[in-house]
Amino acid sequence: EDILIQKGLRVGSYTSPHLVDYNERICINKLPIDDSRLIDSFKLIESVREGILLTYFEYSTLAAFITFNQVDCDAWLIEVGLGGRLDATNIITPSISLITNVALDHQEWLGTSLEEIAKEKAGIISAKIPSIFGDPSLPKNIEQTALEKESDLHVLSRDFFISSNCDSSEWQGKYAVIDSIMIPSHWGPGEYHNLALSLASIEIVDSELLPSSKELNCLLNNFSVSGRFEIIEKKQTWILDVAHNPHAAENLRKRLESLDPYKKITAILSLMQDKDIIGFVKVLDDLVAHWIVCEMDTPRSHSVQTLQKKLIDYGISNVTAESGLLEAFSNVKNHTKKNDRILITGSFEIVGPAKKWLNSE
């Protein structure tokens, strides 16, 4: 997104869920659309749906497509909501299909094994349209789907590469090379791989849009994504991250370890009922001095009692239960010292309220 905007394109991005405001889901050049445009899109959908029942996500997907068409976006960046094969976003024919990785998540919908989940994600691969997989470990179902659909599949560390030495990194595509890349010190493997994936997708669609080393480093120097290892400096250092499964926790751990100087962390945690509590917590536990568990304002949230019991049964003794999110945020603020590190993680539904609360403090 940043690269395309830097090159002068008008870029529409559709992502989900939102953190604070619904409009965040539909952005033009990284700015959420205003209420009037969003309402006009919904009115248009209502005028033509003729009694067809639409889900919450289908409404927002159609609103995004209408908006991007009306404002004549040069590039559409569309994030799948869940899986891929049956997702509402999968009604368009893309210029390229990107799959970042496959991890155990949303098993009640996508399947209980990595290969089952891979099959659902492979559903976004379109016939005779190039596709990319951003992990060196290629699932058989993704490879097979690409073959069946005659999609030219590009795989990280097979068809494009990113490598680093002490001073900088280098990306190598099919024809192009970008060297002297200054990767942010707090990035984890996920961000590193996603950069390689983004550059490869641009080369495949239009190589003239690839940035120079100088242009890329300028972007990376100021790069941030709301709610993804977002650091907010107040009296304490607050770190907001929407990681919610063990795979994402591994990446979060790498990023926490990169912070200097090393400090133990106070972690405020909440997770949805379909998430693996212990699988998530055990990845981070030795970095955390004190766990605060709380319940989110959604019926899908684990109860605070369940979270506390799971952590204690696992062998974690320093666990405090808070009845609500705002109480947790306020109490941690009042009982930690200047420059202490506070991590808020486990879901969009805890990070969003935390961001809103911190902005009001």
Q: At which residue positions do the language-model features occur?
A:
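Nucleotide phosphate-binding/pyrophosphate-handling subdomain across enzymes
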Residues: Q70-V80, D87-L98, V102-H106, E116, ...
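Hydrophobic alpha-helical packing residues
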Residues: D2-L9, F68, L284, L311
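Active-site-proximal loop/hinge segments that shape catalytic or ion-binding/gating pockets
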Residues: S347
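C-terminal helical cap/extension that packs against the catalytic core
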Residues: I132, P136-N141, T145-H154, N165, ...
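Conserved catalytic-core segment of NTP-binding enzymes
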Residues: G84-L86, I92-S151, I277
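Acidic-glycine-rich active-site phosphate/pyrophosphate-binding loop
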Residues: D34-L38, I162-S180
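ATP-dependent carboxylate-amine ligase catalytic core
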Residues: Q6-I92, E108-L110
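Beta-strand->loop->alpha-helix junctions that form or flank phosphate-binding loops
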Residues: Y14, I132-D135, L147-C166, S185-P189, ...
